[in-house]
Amino acid sequence: MTIIRKKHPLIKIINHSFIDLPTPSNISSWWNFGSLLGLCLIIQILTGLFLAMHYTSDTATAFSSVAHICRDVNYGWLIRYMHANGASMFFICLFMHVGRGIYYGSYNMIETWNMGIVLLFAVMATAFMGYVLPWGQMSFWGATVITNLLSAIPYIGTTLVEWIWGGFSVDKATLTRFFAFHFILPFIITALVLVHLLFLHETGSNNPTGLNSDTDKIPFHPYYTIKDFLGVLLLLMAFMILTLFFPDILGDPDNYTPANPLNTPPHIKPEWYFLFAYAILRSIPNKLGGVLALILSILILALMPLLHTSKQKTLTFRPITQTMYWILVADLLILTWIGGQPVEYPFIIIGQAASIAYFTIIVILMPIAGMIENNILDLD
């Protein structure tokens, strides 16, 4: 078996990636989220495949086809709710994974980090298009509002929006193409994940100390396979509790009403995992400015390697930057809350303050904190 494992052209790749991979001996449970994201992707592809067998991407029948899946298809309700809540679990793991990367300075592995940002954008695009497919009220109006943001692009904006819509409004053509893209993107994401892993295995994993761990590596299997398996069990337990006991807790009641272009819902908002970016978008009164802030709220992650001023890689031994980091986490939670609130006082001013704080902490305060810590520790 050992000979096949190390000699066979295909199994050899798997062996070097998941079995004999030299791994730092001290990586914590925060490093589990990569494998959990892989699990989430597999769950989403499988449940999505079975949903696609029964779904029809036509404005006249899309809503009723989802109802048909839940009522008439064997375990259709389970597949549908696993897919809907699987997206939420996916984003929880994504945010934890990115948060770990920021805390432990993993952004210094630039190729891996940049590929991660591309993956984040791809997953967000996939989730957005998936939310449109049930063709409920929030699906329709969410698609209308978010795609309409592109009209803020000077000169070509309006043409671009109509090109994406396939007409003069969100209609059958839009739904059909969104379904096509929603189906193909997870497979593109899978390919990007392999590139992400390829870049990671060029440098090897980071660790909580941020120090070089070449002298203290252990094989991935069995140590981290068993550790990842525990993470998988915990994730599946939380996932099935969410899916079986509280399937609609993260959804919007408006999406149980069929799409009606003549009736606007009182509060148009995306799924919970986009609310922080939506709050940043809404906090700027200018349309183009809002769109730029929305894109920058994610793209700012690409600046992290340039904004790293500390002589230490991680935040493990840096209490000032640690404080900034946890304020940033709290700020993101505030933005998520604000994104789900109506556009009125005091939510507008809180959203604007939280948006300013978000960019200020990342661009100004964390780099300054890094320099202060260098001086305190006399590392310059």
Curated annotation (Swiss-Prot):
Topology of the protein relative to the lipid bilayer: Multi-pass membrane protein
Assigned GO CC terms: mitochondrial inner membrane; respiratory chain complex III
Other comments on record: Heme 1 (or BL or b562) is low-potential and absorbs at about 562 nm, and heme 2 (or BH or b566) is high-potential and absorbs at about 566 nm.
Stretches that traverse the bilayer: 33-53, 77-98, 113-133, 178-198, 226-246, 288-308, 320-340, 347-367
A Pfam entry, by short name: Cytochrom_B_C
SUBUNIT field: The cytochrome bc1 complex contains 11 subunits: 3 respiratory subunits (MT-CYB, CYC1 and UQCRFS1), 2 core proteins (UQCRC1 and UQCRC2) and 6 low-molecular weight proteins (UQCRH/QCR6, UQCRB/QCR7, UQCRQ/QCR8, UQCR10/QCR9, UQCR11/QCR10 and a cleavage product of UQCRFS1). This cytochrome bc1 complex then forms a dimer.
Keywords, comma-separated and alphabetical: Electron transport, Heme, Iron, Membrane, Metal-binding, Mitochondrion, Mitochondrion inner membrane, Respiratory chain, Transmembrane, Transmembrane helix, Transport, Ubiquinone
First and last residue of the signal peptide: none
Protein name: Cytochrome b
GO biological process, one term: mitochondrial electron transport, ubiquinol to cytochrome c
Keyword Electron transport: yes
InterPro entries documented for this protein: Cyt_b/b6_C, Cyt_b/b6_C_sf, Cyt_b/b6_N, Cytb/b6-like_sf, Cytochrome_b, Cytochrome_b_C_euk/bac, Cytochrome_b_N_euk/bac, Di-haem_cyt_TM
Protein's cellular compartments: Mitochondrion inner membrane
Residues that coordinate or bind heme b b562: H83, H182
GO function term, MF aspect, one: metal ion binding
Binding residues annotated for heme b b566, in chain numbering: H97, H196
Protein residues bound to a ubiquinone: H201
Lineage: Eukaryota, Metazoa, Chordata, Craniata, Vertebrata
Its biological purpose: Component of the ubiquinol-cytochrome c reductase complex (complex III or cytochrome b-c1 complex) that is part of the mitochondrial respiratory chain. The b-c1 complex mediates electron transfer from ubiquinol to cytochrome c. Contributes to the generation of a proton gradient across the mitochondrial membrane that is then used for ATP synthesis.
Known cofactor(s): heme b
Protein species of origin: Microtus californicus (California vole)
Cystine connections: none
